[in-house]
């Protein structure tokens, strides 16, 4: 579940898959509006550059908020000259592009169910406190109805 308050001072790690960026954008907006100086990073996984929702606003927010670092991960098509091949979020990408577990950040993960479960498992495997990994998911759960 996602609850972020402007008086929270711990670092914030946001990880979005596709349209899961929408609630995380709200956190980033609130963080900026509050003038909160705690570190905040957003790793945004999309199929290709044209699939990034609110890309212009995210990039503008990152350019004016010294605390926000925005990183894209492209799963199918990366833009020319991109520094990584297309692929899913994995342990190596998280190690390179997210806050280390030692900072005791609160991690917010939102996206399709499979994405959220995989990323949450990777975060815990990297040493993040499971109590600080907050998730929101959408889509099928795999159960029969």
Model-derived features: where do they sit?
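FNR/FR-type flavoprotein reductase catalytic core
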Residues: 1-145
């Amino acid at each position: 579940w996602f609850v972020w308050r402007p008086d929270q001072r711990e670092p914030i790690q946001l990880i979005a898959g596709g349209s899961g960026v929408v609630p995380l954008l709200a956190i980033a907006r609130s963080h900026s509006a509050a003038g909160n100086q705690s570190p905040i990073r957003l790793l945004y996984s999309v199929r290709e550059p044209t699939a990034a929702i609110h890309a212009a606003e995210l990039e503008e927010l990152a350019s004016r908020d010294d605390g926000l670092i925005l990183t894209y991960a492209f799963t199918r098509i990366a833009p020319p000259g991109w520094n990584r091949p297309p692929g899913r979020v994995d342990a190596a990408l998280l190690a390179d592009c997210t806050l280390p577990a030692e900072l005791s950040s609160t991690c917010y993960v939102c996206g399709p169910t499979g994405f959220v479960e995989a990323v949450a498992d990777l975060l815990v495997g990297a040493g993040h406190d499971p109590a600080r990994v907050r998730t929101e998911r959408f889509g099928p759960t795999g159960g029969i109805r």
